Amino acid sequence: MKIIILGAGQVGGTLAEHLADEQNDITVVDERAATLKRLQERLDIRTVLGNGAHPSALLNAGAEDADMLIAVTDSDEINMLACSVAFTLYRTPTKISRVRSADYLAKHQALFESGSIPVDVIIGPEQLVTKN
């Protein structure tokens, strides 16, 4: 499976490590060159330096034939916009976004339910913790 991961922090790096072990074709996009270099030195993955919400970065990452986009940057807005760009321009079939703000998750869930923001799976870590 061809998977693009946006964000090379702790979550993105861990995802890349686990998914690369499962023989997936992984590309990680991030704006921090040193972080990408460290990931690439220890994993068999591709990296792209850039903003994951920019169409050119997604294209360089292979979005035109990617099976999945996982957006786990530290910005909800970049994550949601990246999913929208990937769907609109490249028809990426599966889009997963980390969304941390309760304002998006609790008060304005209709944004996702209506398809206005094309996210197939929302990861809301703070919401999960507070619900349990």
Question: What is each PLM-predicted segment?
Answer:
Residues 1-132:
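Cytosolic regulatory regions of ion transport systems
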